Amino acid sequence: MLKEGLEYTSEVVVTPANCASAVGSGGLDVFATPSMVALMENAAMNCVAPYLPEGSTTVGTEICTTHIKPSALGATIKAVAKLTAVEGRKLLFDVEAYDGDNCIGKGTHVRFIVDIERFMSKL
């Protein structure tokens, strides 16, 4: 059952593929902000996936983040998503990213529950 307080953690290692220089968001070999955002969204998606009706998924519609500190190649980054509100199909999350014990990013994220077939038929 979807309820406030559900949490999920996603993890990734910083590689050349998820660095700013590779994703086009900067010129340095550090963990890219777009990669951090994707990891946060992944944590939120997985947080609620087991509780969705068959044939449903969630789609991200809003994210507001601050990327506080850089992370080097080889660092293990963890993103934690906590479900803070369920408003019908609208799901609100607090999200944070960590490099070890250091918070490197934080923010809020909104997802909506959608019927996959109906959603895809509108494309």
Label every model-predicted segment.
Residues 3-9, 86-93, 99-121:
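C-terminal binding/interaction regions
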Residues 22-24, 120-123:
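Short, charged, solvent-exposed linker or helix-capping segments at domain edges/interfaces
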Residues 14-16, 67, 113:
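Hydrophobic residues in beta-strands and at strand termini
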Residues 1-31:
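Catalytic strand-loop segment that frames the active site of acyl-thioester-processing enzymes
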Residues 45-78:
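Hydrophobic beta-strand-centered segment that forms part of the acyl-chain substrate-binding groove
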Residues 34-37:
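Conserved N-terminal beta-strand and adjoining loop/helix that marks the start
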Residues 65-100:
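Hydrophobic beta-sheet segments that form the core/acyl-binding groove
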